[in-house]
Curated annotation (Swiss-Prot):
Name of the protein in its database record: RNA-binding protein Hfq
A biological-process GO annotation: regulation of RNA stability
Record family assignment: Belongs to the Hfq family.
Keyword RNA-binding attributed: yes
HAMAP family linked: Hfq
Subunit structure: Homohexamer.
Organism this protein belongs to: Desulfitobacterium hafniense (strain DSM 10664 / DCB-2)
InterPro entries in UniProt: Hfq, LSM_dom_sf, Sm
Function summary: RNA chaperone that binds small regulatory RNA (sRNAs) and mRNAs to facilitate mRNA translational regulation in response to envelope stress, environmental stress and changes in metabolite concentrations. Also binds with high specificity to tRNAs.
Electron transport listed as a keyword: no
Domain Sm: from-to ranges: 10-70
Keywords from the named record: RNA-binding, Stress response
Molecular function (Gene Ontology), one example: RNA binding
Length: 83
């Protein structure tokens, strides 16, 4: 059986979303957004801060920095088991 390759971007975003972990998103223009990731797809990320939501296009994102380190090994194993 072929294992599907791990999608690091989706695994990372899904883990911070599930853990309600605050993140700082740095945009390519230098602007910073802080908040919680509420959802994402192939092209966008929805972030919430102080009850307001913003949809940000991924091509505008430079860096996503979580408040704490993410255990990507455990996260990728659990996402593989969910398939």
């Amino acid at each position: 059986m072929n294992k599907a390759p791990i999608n690091l971007q989706d695994t990372f975003l899904n883990q911070v979303r599930k853990e309600n972990m605050p993140v700082t998103i740095y945009l390519v223009n230098g602007f910073q957004l802080k908040g919680l990731v509420r959802g994402f797809d192939n092209f966008t990320v929805v972030i919430e801060f102080e009850g307001k939501q913003q949809m940000v296009y991924k091509h505008a994102i430079s860096t996503v920095m979580p408040l704490r380190p993410i255990n990507l090994v455990a996260a990728s194993q659990s996402s593989t088991e969910e398939r």
